[in-house]
UniProtKB/Swiss-Prot annotation:
The gene is lolA. Residues 1-22 form the signal peptide. Belongs to the LolA family. This is Outer-membrane lipoprotein carrier protein. PANTHER family: OUTER-MEMBRANE LIPOPROTEIN CARRIER PROTEIN. Monomer.
């Protein structure tokens, strides 16, 4: 679940084949352009296909343009996701393991990437529709792990993200106490590998 959220939370795109979708995409782009950086607390609720609550949690969320992301689940079990602009690090303290992938791998895999990625080629992989202050983003590739991401705003403030996976599970994240990052908090996007942890390096290696 955490890896799915990690991939999902580093991505968000646009489709211009139909005017309604193009309008929704442009509206979302405008709202995201107003968020240069953000830090907030979040509360998480995960429900299954029958709307039964299967997990709750809380933590701290931050993002900065371009391609920087911080996701620290503090309860019930700690986990950390950091996108530093180049790589995405997924750290599980309990298992003493960290996975790392290219940020482009995460961006191409899920709709939440648009939060921190303004690239027409990436946006073209998704459909965007909107209702009032909420935008639903779904991948054109139906084999993606995340079937839909919904992001909601109160005017220019990002207030909620909802992730729906192919198994019918829904993860809802309510944001609170939103602030802009100060200089010292930019270090949130720098992941330092702890001692004595296993590293699962999934980054695509360029051929020599």
């Amino acid at each position: 679940m955490n890896k799915l959220i990690a991939i999902a939370i580093v991505s968000l795109p646009l489709l211009t084949h139909f005017s309604a979708q193009a309008d929704a995409s442009e509206q979302l782009k405008v709202k995201l352009a107003e968020i240069d950086n953000l830090k907030a607390n979040f509360s998480q609720t995960v429900t299954d296909i029958n709307d039964k609550v299967i997990q709750t949690g809380e933590g701290v969320f931050a993002l900065a343009q371009p391609n920087q992301f911080y996701w620290h689940l503090t309860a019930p079990d700690e986990s950390l996701i950091v996108a530093d602009g180049t790589d995405v690090w997924i750290y599980n303290p309990f298992n003493e393991e960290v996975s790392v992938m290219d940020v482009n791998q995460a961006i191409s895999a899920s709709p939440i990437a648009l939060l921190v990625h303004d690239d027409a080629k990436t946006w073209a992989q998704y459909q965007v529709t909107n209702t009032d202050q909420c935008f639903a983003i779904s991948p054109i590739d139906k084999d993606a792990g995340v079937s839909e991401v919904e992001v909601c705003f109160n005017e220019t403030t990002l207030t909620e993200m909802v992730l729906k996976d192919q198994q019918g599970n829904t993860s809802s994240f309510l944001l609170s106490e939103q602030t802009t990052l100060d200089k010292s908090e930019k270090n949130l996007f720098k992941f330092v590998v702890p001692e004595d942890v296993d590293i699962d390096d999934q980054r695509l290696k360029s051929p020599n």
